[in-house]
Curated annotation (Swiss-Prot):
The protein, known as: Branched-chain amino acid permease BrnQ
Parts of the chain on the Cytoplasmic side: 1-9, 67-79, 140-149, 211-226, 299-316, 360-369, 426-439
Family annotation (Pfam families): Branch_AA_trans
Organism: Escherichia coli (strain K12)
GO biological process: branched-chain amino acid transport; isoleucine transport; L-leucine transport; valine transport
Location within or outside the cell: Cell inner membrane
Bilayer topology annotation: Multi-pass membrane protein
Topological domains annotated Periplasmic: 31-45, 101-118, 171-189, 248-277, 338, 391-404
Molecular function terms, GO-annotated: L-isoleucine transmembrane transporter activity; L-leucine transmembrane transporter activity; L-valine transmembrane transporter activity
Alphabetic keyword roster: Amino-acid transport, Cell inner membrane, Cell membrane, Membrane, Transmembrane, Transmembrane helix, Transport
Superkingdom assignment: Bacteria
């Protein structure tokens, strides 16, 4: 007998997916864009939504079609290359960068204003924080109950309060856009959404969503795909509504902060202005819940993935990943971002290429011909973008600085599109040769 999810479980799955996506970066970036974009806020918002909502939802759908794992999604590039890509992806959005960052961001926004940002408070906070992350992550079968039915609703309630306040009680009027947004509001919004790295997160979370449905007794592939797609679409709608409210919050906060302020400062100023003395506590609770849920999802997904390739149990890996993330988090937010941005900028393009081209697999004689070369090119030019975003940008040759869209951090895009066209021509030509030789 085919087991189907109840409506309540489907909604909980959607809540869980939304909650897994919304980390501190998702709450901080939109107000920054809104403040700096000024009168061009909705043009910038459109660009932001394409990369911060459209691409991640597309990734969830792509993963659902192959059963939830990035290793399955990457079969056209070969097993070794696929496992290597998946490993790099999981490490980057797991214990090396994204998971530790959830602790440092929640500390600096919620705790540091009270304790100062010295090493000891951060160490104590990270110890408690990752103890909770490990405890929740040890029971993946209960993830839907813990996150979908408890933590996610708390998180959503806090976000709804903030979003409604931003619309009902604007802090002031819209200021004039900065020079960058006056000249290119759409592309700046597009790049800021790209830098949230949610597509990488989606590649990791896909297997978490599928396994959460499996834990409710769903085994049929068709139903697993359907429920995962529904969860992704529900999360996409939630993200869009949240981002639009946060854009409004940022665009109306020009009277509270300088236009160069970061997202945490904008949120803190707005919440203090609107909610008074309790504002700091509300913001701290919001960021803590957002970061904690994201960290749990990342830890579960990474442990599930590495358990397939190393002779360690899932529970042992949860302890290792949680402990390692705690150690890395004590580098502090600024240093962690400085190290992570170039690496993430380099590995993001081939992941985008893989996700987009995965929907075309059935169109080609040999999907490897069409998918592998563009991924390789996107990685090469993504590395150039990564170097440009690092402290070693001076070593880049002058031609690399003059590439189309290089200023926007998207130098990989045009060469990848050209390679896709060439790969399609190659596939058609090689396919015809095979057909003619068969007669």
């Amino acid at each position: 007998m085919t087991h189907q999810l109840r409506s309540r479980d489907i909604i909980a799955l959607g809540f869980m997916t939304f909650a897994l996506f919304v980390g501190a970066g998702n709450i901080i970036f939109p107000p920054m864009v809104g403040l700096q974009a000024g009168e061009h806020v909705w043009t910038a918002a459109f660009g932001f939504l394409i990369t911060a909502v459209g691409l991640p939802v597309l990734t969830v759908v792509a993963l659902a079609k192959v059963g939830g794992g990035v290793d399955s999604l990457s079969t056209p590039i070969g097993k070794v290359a696929g496992v290597l890509l998946a490993t790099v992806c999981y490490l980057a959005v797991g214990p090396l960068f994204a998971t530790p960052r959830t602790a440092t961001v929640s500390f600096e926004v919620g705790i540091a204003p009270l304790t100062g940002d010295s090493a000891l408070p951060l160490f104590i906070y990270s110890l408690v924080y990752f103890a909770i992350v490990i405890l929740v992550s040890l029971y993946p079968g209960k993830l839907l109950d813990t996150v979908g039915n408890f933590l996610a609703p708390l998180k959503i309630i806090a976000l709804v309060i903030l979003s409604v306040a931003a619309i009902v009680w604007p802090a002031g009027s819209i200021s004039t856009a900065t020079e960058a947004y006056q000249n290119a509001a759409f592309s700046n919004g597009f790049v800021n959404g790209y830098l949230t790295m949610d597509t990488l997160g989606a590649m990791v979370f896909g297997i978490v969503i599928v396994n959460a449905a499996r834990s409710r007794g769903v085994t049929e592939a068709r139903l697993l795909t359907r429920y995962t797609v529904w969860a992704g679409l529900m999360a996409g709608v939630g993200l869009t509504l949240l981002y639009l409210a946060l854009f409004r919050l940022g665009s109306d906060s020009a009277s509270l902060v300088d236009q160069s302020a970061n997202g945490a400062a904008i949120l803190h100023a707005y919440v203090q202005h609107t909610f008074g003395g309790g504002g700091s506590f509300l913001l701290a609770a919001l960021i803590f819940i957002a970061c904690l849920v994201t960290a749990v999802g990342l830890t579960c997904a990474c442990a599930e993935f590495f358990a397939q390739y190393v002779p360690l149990s899932y529970r042992t890996l949860v302890f290792i990943l949680g402990g390692f993330s705690m150690v890395v988090s004590n580098l502090g937010l600024s240093q962690l971002i400085q190290i992570s941005v170039p690496v993430l900028t380099a590995i993001y393009p081939p992941c985008i290429a893989l996700v987009v081209l995965s929907f075309t697999r059935s169109w080609w004689h040999n999907s490897s011909r069409v998918i592998a070369p563009p991924m390789f090119i996107s990685l090469l030019f993504g590395i150039l973008d990564g170097i440009k975003a690092s402290a070693f940008s001076d070593i880049l040759p002058s031609w690399a600085q003059r590439l189309p869209l290089a200023e926007q951090g998207l130098a990989w895009l045009m060469p990848t599109v050209v390679m896709v066209v060439l790969a399609i021509i190659w596939d058609r030509a090689a396919g015809r040769q095979v057909t003619s030789s068969a007669h």
